[in-house]
Amino acid sequence: VHTPDGSPCGLLNHISLSCAPLPSEEIDCQMMSGKFKKLLTQLGMSPISSDFGLIYPHKYIPVVLDGRVMGYIDPNLAPKLVNSLRAIKIMQSNTDELYECVPKTLEIAYLAMIEDAETQSAQTKASDEEIKDKFYPGIFLASTPARFVRPVQNLEHGGIEFIGPLEQVNMS
């Protein structure tokens, strides 16, 4: 949607007849956090430790849940983690206790690295204008209320998936 009204364009693009605001939490976030961190670790994420003893490679990208960094993941493993989370979110049929912590309305926005530092240094340096439009890479997960979600058909997993605005513009 191309509208002259400026900043709300992304939200206007997301809103449809089936779009709905989430009035309350689907799952208790405090209870979910610990189990969810275990699940993300099983799917390939390196969790953050409280002793700050781990230093992650520069190329690793953050995994963020509701604004809190849960850990980091190798960019080569990130698509697999995202795909697995989508499958769990859509299927909701596995009886494993860890899978119960994934809400059906979880927003899974994967912002992949555009190019790594070696590729950029091998090519000509980008101008300030080109750099300005790039974003911070990571896997950004949102489970809190007061978000817009809308149902879409996920062709890969054969089910209905609820997506949010950030997720919509970064889906491939």
Describe these PLM feature segments:
Residues 1-172:
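Conduit-forming functional cores of very large proteins
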